[in-house]
Every structure is written in structure tokens, then in C-alpha cells.
Amino acid sequence: MGITVRNLHKRFGEFAALDDVSLDFPAGELVALLGPSGCGKTTLLRVIAGLEHADSGQVVLQGLDVASVGARERQVGFVFQHYALFRHMTVFENVAFGLRVKPRRERPSEAAIRAKVHELLSLVQLDWLAQRYPSELSGGQRQRIALARALAVEPKVLLLDEPFGALDAKVRKELRGWLRRLHDDLHISTIFVTHDQEEALEVADRIVVLNHGRVEQVGSPQAVYDHPRSAFVYEFLGAANRLDGTVSGNGFVAHGAAQAIAVDADFAGPARAYVRPHDLELAAPHARAQGIAADVRRVVPLGGSVRVELAARSGEVLEAELDRNAWRALALDVGDALTAVPRAVRVFPAR
């Protein structure tokens, strides 16, 4: 089922949680709402679910304005960050709950409920835990059971509010891949909230970046990462080095640098340039005409890569990320002088 929201406004006192938000969510897509705390992503999810009401604007499900439709009638499945499983019920009973509390005329037979629950537990690969209680499960298992419970009532839309936020990093990574595979099997329209950039980039078909209640950018993960429309989007989507300087006909000149760096810019004047740590190449001093003079401040091994912290002569602190072969070839020590050469630079007007 496709979802459309039009001109949504929602305030909590003086705070604008949603400020004229309009979006289309095509049927069958897995869409991430990404942004910092307080950006409006959870409020938007709750308005779509019917758990909050917008001050103005429309929510359209299957072509119908559902402003006057309650949460229960919207046929939406909702999964919270903190599982919300019933502690006194077994896994089986938790998943069956939504089916058993349906109105009598809509309620399946007990045999049909049993079959449905076992089907869903098999889908989330936890059928063997049917008679366990939530206290006997790991965090990752509880969240998969919560998802099975949401799917039991066959929702038209699945809404996930930071579903993996309470889990440790290793389990989160495993469940991200599992959620993507599950979505590919079910093709149910899904919107999930996250502040984890890596999670959004890995799992989603499309990303909606929100900031201060407004939509900053919408697009595929690759498009949003490679072509950010604002400095906020660039910085939020991953580690970034920031350089202040000026754009002129020769390119971008960082404060304190002698040489311009070639950039693609449609403006001139004060600017802020960004470069990812993995796009910062390190070379011997004066080895490159275009580059930033810097000294090594710290070297941090990170498993398969090495992070090198640099003190630029212009005063900025920069980070470069090298693979271990490049690091060994450079034989860097703290205090060494070098030239940092940006391979891919994005510039935005200074504000």
C-alpha cells in the first residue's frame, strides 16, 4: 500500500516537530527516516500510524485521507525500539495476541491462528522458541518476535521505530541484513526510523533525511551519499573533514593554503569544503602541488584500516583513513610532516 503525506504540521508548544512535510512512499518500498534526535522522524511515523494527530495536513493510505481513522483501523503494524512484549505470555501467545483480540466476526479459528503463528515464527527463524518467555530470549530474538507479532494481523504497512536501537553493535548488524532479506520476501511497504547512517545506507531502498522538522533530501542511499544537497546532509551521512576557505575561478583555497584545489562549484566567495577521511590521500611534504600541509598528531589502528589524525598548518584537525598496506608504505610516526591531498571535495557556501 502506498502512503502519501501532504503539508504536515505538528507543534509541541513552541517546538515545531513537523514543518510542512510532504512525502510519497511508494508501495512495497523500504524507506528509512534518518536524522538526529528531535528532527521529527518519530513524530512523522506516529502521525502515519494514527498514534499522534497532525495540527494540519493530510495522511493518505490507499488513496483515502485517514485523518479521522483511528490507529486500529489503519491496518498498520508498529514495532517499537523496546520490544513491548507481554512478559507473562509465551512467544507463541505474544505472536497470537493480535489475532485473538480481533472482533469475533473477524477472528480466525484457533487452528488457523496456530498455523499462522508457526508460519511467522518460521519466517523469523525462531519457531523452536515458541514456548519460551520473553525473559528467556536475547535482545535480538525479542525484537524478531515483536516483528512477527506485528506481521500476524497482516498489516498493509509496517512501521519500525528504531527497531535495533537497544541492541549491541554486532546484533544490530546481523538484524539489518535479516530485515532486508525479510522485506525482499514479503514486499510489504515499510518505513523505519533510525539515527544510524550505516543502517539506513545498508537496508533502505530510499532515504528521507530530516532536520528541524523539515525534509532535507530524499533519494536512494547512493544518490544521497554521493550527491548531498546541503552541508548538513554531507556531515550527517558519515565522518567528514571540514575546511573553511574561498571558492574562486581557480578552485577552492583553504585558509592558510597556497594552492587551490579543483572543485565543481556554481558559486564564488566564502565557502566550506568537505572531504571524507577515506578520500584524503597522504603524501610526502611538497610531493603534490595541490594539498594541505599537515603534521601527524595520532595514529589509531582500527582492525583492517588505520585512522591518522592530522594537525593542518592552517589550524584544522583532519582525519585520514588508510588501508594497512598504504599505512605501512608511508611508515608514519607522530610528528611527521606530510601533504594531505583531497581526492573528492564537496563545497557549499559558508553560512
From Swiss-Prot:
Q: Which GO terms describe its cellular component?
A: ATP-binding cassette (ABC) transporter complex
Tell me the SUPFAM superfamilies matching this sequence. Answer: MOP-like (SSF50331), P-loop containing nucleoside triphosphate hydrolases (SSF52540)
List where in the cell it is found. Cell inner membrane
| InterPro entries assigned | AAA+_ATPase (IPR003593), ABC_SmlMolc_Importer (IPR050093), ABC_transporter-like_ATP-bd (IPR003439), ABC_transporter-like_CS (IPR017871), Mo/tungstate-bd_C_term_dom (IPR008995), P-loop_NTPase (IPR027417), Sulph_transpt1 (IPR005666), TOBE-like (IPR024765)
Instruction: Write one Pfam family the protein is assigned to.
Output: ABC_tran
Look up the EC number in the record and give it: 7.3.2.3
PANTHER family referenced in this protein's UniProt entry, alphabetically: SPERMIDINE/PUTRESCINE IMPORT ATP-BINDING PROTEIN POTA (PTHR42781), SPERMIDINE_PUTRESCINE IMPORT ATP-BINDING PROTEIN POTA (PTHR42781:SF4)
Q: How is the quaternary structure described?
A: The complex is composed of two ATP-binding proteins (CysA), two transmembrane proteins (CysT and CysW) and a solute-binding protein (CysP).
Family, similarity comment = Belongs to the ABC transporter superfamily. Sulfate/tungstate importer (TC 3.A.1.6) family.
Indicate what this protein is called per its UniProt record.
Sulfate/thiosulfate import ATP-binding protein CysA
Q: Organism source for this protein?
A: Burkholderia mallei (strain ATCC 23344)
